[in-house]
Amino acid sequence: PALLAQNASEFNFSVGARIYNDGNQGQGNVSLRATVTNPAGNLVYDNSVSGLNISSVDSADVYPTGNFTLADFSLASYPAGTYTLTYTASLDSLDEYASDNSISYTFTISESIYSAAKIDTATGLPSGKTFYRPSTNNQTFSICSAINNPNASRLAVEGLYFAATKGIVVPEDSLMAGEEMNLTLYKWEDVFADL
């Protein structure tokens, strides 16, 4: 939520990637560019690193303590909305399959919602369209999301959203009517020692 991202000291993250060379030729002087656009579509982060040499069927890493690094993403303020982080790899030579040289991710700063799920930009609510569960789910299944933030005292829980799914081998199996759901919210009062 925006209350946890008031300025650069409260919200920032390391930027990095692993670049793969699936081709049969080594690649010299590969560069990686990372950009972030804000909710208005303006470029607010643009950094790159070059000089990566990647052998055939190998990879190279760009990360904070490695040989190749990108600056952390950090802004003076964070307007609410959806941001887009894009990584683009470039080569000095002809790339016979350039369509996999770029990948984008989005993240949302919401006015009031903390979510591990993707946020629907039209409604501002968590999107219940992607589900994760054990492949053989013959017991109860639970998931935990912990908030460890020095500014979490600014927040108060006013409600919980959840989504659920069932198998659809038989169309009627997907109906949730009559199913029991148990939502539990715990307050962790012990010291976070190793999270």
Model-identified regions with their sequence ranges:
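Short acidic/proline- and small/hydrophobic-mixed sequence motifs that coincide with surface turns
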Residues: 24-29, 44, 155-157, 178
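Conserved aromatic beta-strand anchor motif in extracellular beta-sandwich/beta-rich domains
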Residues: 32-38, 183-187
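Enriched for extracellular/lumenal, surface-exposed ectodomains of secreted and cell-surface proteins
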Residues: 35-37, 79, 83-99
